[in-house]
């Protein structure tokens, strides 16, 4: 699923930023969205609030995965300058003061991606009589599916559980707990004496994913200077893709070692420890402290003082400096306004009515097809697929997986560069067509072309490349654009849960279905679903390129 997370923030940032210049109405300024985690996945009650002057227009962002930088009430893209909280000029800062508050939360994303890449090699090692180092290596397809998807089910549970406690915990404590869960999950999985303990470790690790993918984008967005917020959030998502590549790479080095799967999963331990110690050294989010004050959880002046101390520490300024005091005063006003605005929102059932239902059909359909065309299987089972596709040596299969990871990273940048130039529909239609072709090629390889392993490699590269320019980023860009303002947060919440749930199911079902149907028929099935998704894109998905959020609602959702 992270799988789709590599550049979601970047595209949402660009889409929302565009509307400011085209139609800077009060409604545009109040645009809000929830982002994914990818995935990860923020509470409906969560938001980050910023004030833009003049006019003191308040913008609220409801997050599920992406958070962006604001400029004049909208998001600022990488490197662009946005209004500060305190004045019309950008907030002054030193890069040295923002590196650690970015790096430590971003490690949560890297560990998420790492699990995807490492699992690809670990499944080969675990099932090898010679390399597993265990007596319980002979997994059934269902058991293998549970091992691979265990972290995803844990992430789903974590993302649901955090809804009720996120405001109480705060972003810093949430990320510390996530690091502890990552640490325990890595240790338990790496040292597991049997399958049951292994599954417990996978579940705990996944629970950490759910918390980290919720807390990390919030902490980064709420603590970094506004003019670089978009850059840092985009880099945070890039950490997930780098994590996937790192997992593939570690797998390729450890695949020939007896019990190498233990090292693959255990590698997350020192990274999780670094993340936990790093978050422990950082202060709480100043905006979260102000939110607690607005919620009536303590004395206003006490929370304001804590927020000023936290902001001063984050910026490397003396405690209680005047700049931090002014920033906190302005931030408190925006948090209070946004909190009161949240109370006046519509009820949950509105998502299933009128134009909202049309938006849910478009957004929910895209994230559903994103997963059921087999995308999770290609990443989690890349090593196994390559091994059955002619690279019988586990080392060869894992090394080719690294090539796939590098190609995925490169195609991510292609998508970033072209999505606003070419539009959503052309990239979706072309990309999904390529996905269908690649799946049919994989089916043909297993059925007719077994003597040509390069066909399988080419098909996998084609799949990854086409996914990265279509479903991967554009599904979440469309989701961030398509919902009407009043129901945007709730609609994107449903889209995120649809994505996470379908991802877990597809990942679990791949191994049993491969055993039951055969690889050639399974990829043929995925190819057929890809054709259905192509038809869905052609008939249902509109072009939103160049349209403001208001124009999307008035012209497309009428």
Curated annotation (Swiss-Prot):
NCBIfam families this protein is in? SP
Q: Which InterPro entries match?
A: MFS_dom, MFS_sugar_transport-like, MFS_Sugar_Transporter, MFS_trans_sf, Sugar/inositol_transpt, Sugar_transporter_CS
Its chief place of residence is: plastid
Protein family: Belongs to the major facilitator superfamily. Sugar transporter (TC 2.A.1.1) family.
Q: What's one GO MF term for it?
A: transmembrane transporter activity
Chain segments annotated as transmembrane? 98-118, 146-166, 175-195, 197-217, 238-258, 264-284, 359-379, 400-420, 426-446, 449-469, 491-511, 522-542
Pfam families registered for this protein in UniProt: Sugar_tr
Keyword Nucleus found: no
Protein name from the UniProt record: D-xylose-proton symporter-like 3, chloroplastic
Protein location? Plastid, Chloroplast membrane
Membrane topology, as annotated, equals: Multi-pass membrane protein
Q: Where is the transit peptide?
A: 1-31
Q: Give GO cellular component annotations, separated by semicolons.
A: chloroplast; chloroplast envelope; chloroplast membrane; plastid
**GO biological process, any:** D-glucose transmembrane transport
Asked if the Swiss-Prot or TrEMBL record annotates the protein with the keyword Transport, the reply is yes
Q: Any idea which UniProt keywords this protein has?
A: Chloroplast, Membrane, Plastid, Sugar transport, Transit peptide, Transmembrane, Transmembrane helix, Transport
Q: What PROSITE patterns does its record include?
A: MFS, SUGAR_TRANSPORT_2
């Amino acid at each position: 699923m992270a799988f789709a997370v590599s550049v979601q923030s970047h595209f949402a940032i660009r889409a929302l930023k565009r509307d400011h210049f085209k139609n800077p109405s009060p409604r545009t300024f109040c645009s809000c969205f929830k982002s994914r985690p990818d995935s990860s996945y923020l509470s409906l009650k969560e938001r980050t609030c910023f004030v833009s002057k003049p006019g003191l227009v308040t913008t609220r962002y409801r997050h599920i995965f992406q958070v962006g930088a604001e400029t004049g009430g909208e998001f600022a893209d990488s490197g662009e300058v946005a209004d500060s909280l305190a004045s019309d000029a950008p907030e002054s800062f030193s890069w040295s003061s923002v590196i650690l508050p970015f790096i430590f939360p971003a490690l949560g994303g890297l560990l998420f991606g790492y699990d995807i890449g490492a699992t690809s090699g670990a499944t080969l090692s675990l099932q090898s009589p010679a390399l597993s180092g265990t007596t319980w290596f002979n997994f059934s397809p269902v058991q293998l599916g549970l091992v691979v998807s265990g972290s995803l089910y844990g992430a789903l549970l974590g993302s649901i559980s955090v809804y009720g406690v996120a405001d109480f915990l705060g972003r810093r404590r949430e990320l510390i707990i996530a690091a502890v869960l990552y640490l325990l999950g890595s240790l338990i999985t790496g040292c597991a004496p049997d399958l049951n303990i292994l599954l417990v470790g996978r579940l705990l690790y996944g629970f950490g994913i759910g918390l980290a993918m919720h807390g990390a984008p919030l902490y980064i967005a709420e603590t970094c200077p506004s003019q670089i917020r978009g850059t840092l959030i985009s880099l945070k998502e890039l950490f997930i893709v780098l994590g996937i590549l790192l997992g593939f790479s570690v797998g390729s080095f450890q695949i020939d070692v007896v019990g190498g799967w233990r090292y693959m999963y255990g590698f997350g331990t020192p990274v999780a420890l670094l993340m936990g110690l790093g978050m422990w050294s950082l202060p709480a989010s100043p905006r979260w402290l102000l939110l607690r004050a607005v919620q009536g959880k303590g004395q206003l002046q006490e929370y304001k003082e804590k927020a000023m101390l936290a902001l001063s520490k984050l910026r490397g300024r003396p405690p209680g400096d005047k700049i931090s005091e002014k920033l906190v005063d302005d931030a408190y006003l925006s948090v209070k306004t946004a909190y009161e605005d949240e109370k006046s929102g519509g009820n949950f059932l509105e998502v299933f009515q009128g134009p909202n239902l049309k938006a849910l059909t478009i957004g929910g359909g895209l994230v559903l097809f994103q997963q059921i065309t087999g995308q999770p299987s290609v990443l989690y089972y890349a090593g196994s697929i390559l091994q059955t596709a002619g690279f019988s040596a586990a080392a060869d299969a894992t090394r080719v997986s690294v090539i796939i990871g590098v190609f995925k990273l490169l195609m991510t940048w292609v998508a970033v560069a072209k999505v606003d130039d070419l539009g959503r529909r052309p990239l979706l239609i072309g990309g999904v067509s390529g996905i269908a072709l690649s799946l049919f090629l994989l089916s043909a390889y297993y059925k007719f072309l077994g003597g040509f392993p390069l066909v399988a490699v080419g098909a996998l590269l084609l799949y990854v490349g086409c996914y990265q320019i279509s479903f991967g980023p554009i599904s979440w860009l469309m989701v961030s654009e398509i919902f009407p303002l009043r129901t945007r947060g709730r609609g994107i919440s449903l889209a995120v849960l649809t994505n996470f749930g379908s991802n877990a199911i597809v990942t679990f079902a791949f191994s049993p279905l491969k055993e039951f149907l055969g690889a050639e028929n399974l990829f043929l099935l995925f190819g057929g679903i890809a054709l259905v998704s192509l038809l869905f894109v052609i008939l249902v998905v509109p072009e939103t390129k160049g349209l403001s959020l208001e124009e999307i609602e008035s012209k497309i959702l009428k």
